[in-house]
Amino acid sequence: FHRKYYHPSNSYIYLYGDMDVVERLEWMDKEYLSKYDYLEVDSEIKKQKPFDKPCFVKKEYAISDSEKEEESAVLISNFVIGDSLDIELNIAFQILEYAIMQMPGAPLKQALIEANIGKDVTGSYEDDILQPVYSITAKYANEADADKLNQMIDRTLENIVRTGIHKDALRAGLNSLEFKT
């Protein structure tokens, strides 16, 4: 793996500053690049095939003696959100996510809190990979509430689709995004 992907053939070399570019390239070739044979490297990042059905993973982790086992689970639901190269979708999702999960009184977060699924409910959007992932996490939860978490997410999102999102919430999401960038 390392010899194939961490090879000069699979790299970009950037030069910066005031210099004689031809002289610098000749030096790089003599001192570095000429010591390697060219490799044809297919380093395209392939999209992961969607799961045919939901996938459940259970992992054990240590808790302190003062923690109750029935209130120490971390429940996470993950969703692939398009493609990171779709800038419009990426921006729209960040605005939407703020409106339904981050802002005070956000409907999805509020529904999960009111359903008593965990003591700390958060959403996070990882958009620095080819297929961005949105995660909804309930910490200090009961493991038995895993199905309840997914049902509440589905039910609440269906309700949001039916009833819509207030324009002020979307404006707040846009303002939040503008503030971050």
Predicted features by range, described:
Residues 1-51, 65-93, 98-181:
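Charge-rich, well-structured scaffold segments of protease-associated domains
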Residues 61:
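A conserved beta-turn-beta hairpin within the catalytic core of GNAT-like acetyltransferases
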Residues 52-58:
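Intrinsically disordered, low-complexity regulatory segments
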